[in-house]
């Protein structure tokens, strides 16, 4: 059967449940995924004086073809975007500034250092998101930044975050879509602290300073991201979930939930509905934690589907900013972007193709047998045929055909790049 014939047959199956497949695809097309640039170069960035990767983050593997220049990274992103249906966004860290080989400190970064990124995004019709980089730097060597007891170090990082908000504002003005500028810090202690309050008090004061400059939300949205623990901060993290949730609600900022930043038995999908009751908008970094915050490539597993379902069921496609955050140097990096982003979009499509209203009614009426039965039966409904048709409509490869494009790109481009030292 052809793609169209499969689509028509699948469409009929869904229409029996009152599901408007064409409307579902229209909604899906409007959802941008923020694709993180750092998968392409193992979070190295382009600083003249690069620091070793720190902040409790680790990238393993040494697959050939890592991007080593801004041009290579943008070229790789373009390749991935050509294989992913829809119009999306690219998420940058401050270490991806282009300073023309001049050593520019992070607290001195300006919009001009990201002009090439903006021109590129404008040409492709992309939005840009941003992150200050509070790791891989000598002033973060002891694992403390915005909560540091040394006021000089603290001030340096405050200035860096202020500079990054201005860069985010620049992105938003130039591209006509608000930039999400997200702050994550590695601050914490390896062993049991004797004072949990004072570092958090300093962090609160630092954030107050950073956000004191009024920037229109038409151009820049601020988010803050928590974490349960990291390498070197196993016992205590200053920016805990409770801290940032309270700060975000009190100060009208977005709380960003990273799917790898909680206890392995906690799920972000279970938090979304609670958050939506108290905030107009929230942000996600979708990753795949394997026993810890390992940042594996996103796969179409139960939790990814549940995240998508919570967004769709609660009519929150415009309220939740969906970003990705994973990095794997053991596989083709362009393929990693492609696999992870396509899976995020697949999960959203899956959620859009469920009879969510009827399933809610079953729950309200206490008809739990039917609820479970239908939720399970829909797992084998022909959503793949709808996905294939959507990919064809969007002009991207259907099924695994994209993999042949990746293999060709690897042979013609990636394997011709100079080998780099392994990161293990």
From Swiss-Prot:
E.C. numbers: 5.3.1.14
The protein's annotated pathway: Carbohydrate degradation; L-rhamnose degradation; glycerone phosphate from L-rhamnose: step 1/3
GO cellular component, one term: cytoplasm
Catalytic activity: L-rhamnopyranose = L-rhamnulose
Protein name: L-rhamnose isomerase
Originating organism: Bacillus subtilis (strain 168)
Purpose: Catalyzes the interconversion of L-rhamnose and L-rhamnulose.
Comment on bound cofactor: Binds 1 Mn(2+) ion per subunit.
Disulfide bonds: none
Keywords: Cytoplasm, Isomerase, Manganese, Metal-binding, Rhamnose metabolism
SUPFAM superfamilies xrefs: Xylose isomerase-like
Biological process per Gene Ontology, one example term: rhamnose catabolic process
UniProt-annotated location(s): Cytoplasm
The protein's required cofactors: Mn(2+)
Gene name of this polypeptide: rhaA
Keyword Isomerase: yes
The family this protein is said to belong to: Belongs to the rhamnose isomerase family.
HAMAP family: RhaA
Keyword Lipid biosynthesis in annotation: no
Binding site for Mn(2+): 261, 293, 295
Main localization (coarse): cytoplasm
GO function terms (MF aspect): L-rhamnose isomerase activity; manganese ion binding
């Amino acid at each position: 059967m052809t793609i169209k014939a499969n689509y028509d047959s699948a469409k009929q199956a869904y229409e029996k449940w009152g599901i408007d497949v064409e409307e579902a695809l229209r909604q899906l097309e409007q959802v941008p995924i923020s694709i993180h640039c750092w998968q392409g170069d193992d979070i190295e960035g382009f600083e003249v004086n690069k620091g070793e990767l720190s902040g409790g983050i680790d990238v393993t593997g040494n697959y050939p073809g890592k991007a080593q220049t801004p041009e290579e990274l943008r070229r790789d992103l373009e390749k991935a975007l050509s294989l992913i249906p829809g119009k999306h966004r690219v998420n940058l860290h401050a270490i991806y500034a282009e300073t023309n080989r001049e050593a520019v400190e992070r607290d001195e970064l300006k919009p001009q250092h990201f002009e090439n990124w903006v021109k590129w995004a404008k040409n492709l019709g992309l939005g840009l998101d941003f992150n200050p980089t509070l790791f891989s730097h000598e002033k973060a060597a002891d694992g403390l930044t915005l909560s540091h007891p040394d006021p000089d170090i603290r001030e340096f990082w405050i200035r860096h975050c202020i500079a990054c908000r201005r860069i985010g504002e620049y992105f938003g003005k130039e591209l006509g879509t608000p930039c999400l500028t997200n702050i994550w810090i590695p601050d914490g202690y390896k062993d049991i602290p004797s004072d949990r309050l004072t570092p958090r008090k300093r962090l609160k004061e630092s954030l107050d300073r950073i956000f004191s400059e009024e920037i229109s939300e038409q151009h820049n949205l601020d988010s803050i991201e928590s974490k349960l623990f990291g390498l070197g901060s196993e016992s205590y993290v200053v920016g805990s979930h409770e801290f940032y949730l309270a700060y975000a609600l009190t100060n009208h900022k977005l709380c960003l939930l990273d799917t790898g930043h909680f206890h392995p038995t906690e799920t972000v999908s279970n938090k979304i509905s609670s958050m939506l009751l108290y905030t107009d908008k929230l942000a996600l970094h979708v990753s795949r934690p394997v026993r810890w915050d390992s940042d594996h490539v996103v796969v179409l597993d139960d939790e990814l589907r549940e995240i998508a379902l919570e967004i769709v069921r609660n009519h929150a496609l415009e309220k939740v900013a969906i970003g990705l955050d994973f990095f794997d140097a053991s596989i083709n990096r362009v393929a990693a972007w492609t696999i992870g982003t396509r899976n995020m979009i697949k999960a959203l499509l899956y959620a859009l193709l469920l009879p969510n209203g009827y399933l809610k009614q079953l729950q309200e009426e206490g008809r739990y047998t039917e609820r479970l039965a239908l939720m399970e039966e829909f797992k084998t409904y022909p959503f793949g045929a709808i996905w294939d048709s959507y990919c064809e409509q969007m002009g991207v490869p259907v099924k695994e055909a994209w993999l042949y494009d990746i293999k060709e790109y690897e042979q013609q481009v990636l394997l011709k790049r100079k080998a780099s030292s392994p990161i293990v």
